[in-house]
């Protein structure tokens, strides 16, 4: 028997807490499941949204465990598990779930890797001369590998699931260049797909921070003239050419009334994609109205909408974990870390996320 600590919640009105149970490592898993001793996990906005929206009448009174992203070591493997996943393998990935007693904010994570395929063998990030070195060597591979699966997988879906073919002539406009999904997107877009032009909209104070990741152009929203600023850029730098895709990672409606001026015709296969809907979510006080607005649902089913529109949801597939492995090995990708907290500092980690001021991912070290 071992101790299983988990960071849990009952509903959005209760405070997160560490709950402790006894776990029988030899009998806690099915023959198609693996048991991972978690080294690090990362906190994501979805964790706080699910927590904030939970009510006992809807989600029950049992403790639910936070967390999706993880890095760790396989300590048990069932007899029917694919032999590529063996005891002592160092792995990372995303445990895709909504609610339940299993989550990555735990000492041990149990799941079926044939169903939850977003898992990979952990990679060693290049160090020293020639490496991307966005984190200046501050963090170990457990931290780095735990930080990115969800945001990387989301960025991969944006680029792989909607546009049939990317070329050096392709153009993307990203609303919210400073988010971590957008940070992954720019690295994948420029270094894997070789997309010709990627433009990001962000705070002008973040230009210097963002430039090193590969943005071709950055546009400020500070003066309240985002539409005018993007129009000027298109006229002066892009030959008046429109975008193949507009990706919204923050929640914005500015472009909808004038979408035809910026997005190529629907018939070309262009897309407007979002991960948050039309409005920025308040992670401290999320509401169903903002998390699942009717306007988003209507855009998705409206046959008369003049442009292709979709929300992006990351799935438990292995494609993006394989791509991340390839890009790390080629020194083409490195996630950015804002801060690392110890397990009992989970509330500080959550509070930092809720400030919306983190410059990179927030990671919790579960076991050393």
Swiss-Prot record:
The keyword Mitochondrion applies. One of its GO terms (cellular component) is mitochondrion. It comes from the Eukaryota. Keywords: Lipid droplet, Mitochondrion. This is Protein YIM1. SMART domains: PKS_ER (SM00829). The keyword Mitochondrion applies. It is found in: Lipid droplet; Mitochondrion. InterPro entries: ADH-like_N, GroES-like_sf, NAD(P)-bd_dom_sf, PKS_ER, YIM1/Zinc_Alcohol_DH_Fams. It comes from Candida glabrata (strain ATCC 2001 / BCRC 20586 / JCM 3761 / NBRC 0622 / NRRL Y-65 / CBS 138) (Yeast). One of its GO terms (molecular function) is alcohol dehydrogenase [NAD(P)+] activity. Belongs to the YIM1 family. The gene is YIM1. CDD domains: AST1_like (cd08247). Gene3D superfamilies: Medium-chain alcohol dehydrogenases, catalytic domain, NAD(P)-binding Rossmann-like Domain. One of its GO terms (biological process) is DNA damage response.
């Amino acid at each position: 028997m071992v101790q299983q600590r988990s960071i849990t919640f009952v509903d959005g009105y209760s405070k997160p807490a560490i709950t402790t149970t006894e776990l029988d490592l030899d009998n806690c898993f099915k023959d198609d499941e693996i048991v991972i001793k978690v080294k690090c996990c990362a906190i994501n906005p979805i964790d706080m949204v699910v927590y904030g929206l939970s009510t006992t009448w809807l989600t029950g009174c049992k403790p639910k465990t936070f967390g999706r992203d993880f890095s760790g070591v396989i300590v048990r493997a069932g007899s029917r598990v694919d032999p590529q996943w063996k005891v002592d393998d160092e792995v990372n990935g995303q445990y895709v779930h909504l609610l339940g007693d299993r989550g990555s904010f735990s000492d041990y994570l149990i799941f079926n890797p044939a169903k939850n395929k977003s898992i990979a063998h952990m990679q060693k990030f290049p160090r020293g001369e020639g490496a991307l070195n966005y984190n200046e060597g501050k963090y170990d591979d457990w931290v780095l590998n735990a930080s990115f699966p969800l945001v990387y997988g989301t960025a991969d879906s944006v680029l792989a699931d909607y546009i049939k073919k990317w070329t050096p002539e392709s153009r993307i406009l990203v609303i919210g260049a400073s988010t971590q999904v957008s940070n992954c997107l720019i690295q994948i877009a420029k270094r894997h797909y070789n997309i010709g032009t990627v433009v990001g909209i962000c705070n002008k104070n973040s230009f210097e921070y963002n430039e090193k990741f590969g943005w071709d152009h950055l546009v400020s929203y500070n003066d309240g003239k985002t539409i005018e600023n993007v129009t000027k850029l298109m006229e002066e730098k892009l030959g008046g050419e429109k975008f193949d895709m507009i990706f919204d990672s923050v929640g914005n409606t500015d472009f909808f009334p004038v979408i035809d001026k910026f997005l190529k015709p629907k018939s070309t296969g262009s897309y407007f994609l979002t991960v948050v809907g039309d409005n920025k979510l308040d992670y401290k006080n999320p509401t169903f109205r903002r998390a699942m607005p009717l306007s988003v649902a209507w855009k998705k089913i409206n046959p008369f909408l003049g442009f292709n529109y979709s929300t992006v949801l990351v799935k438990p597939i292995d494609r993006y974990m394989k791509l991340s492995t390839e890009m790390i090995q080629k020194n083409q990708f490195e996630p950015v870390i804002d801060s690392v907290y110890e397990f009992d500092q989970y509330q500080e980690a959550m509070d930092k996320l809720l400030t919306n001021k983190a410059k990179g991912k927030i990671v919790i070290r579960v076991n050393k």
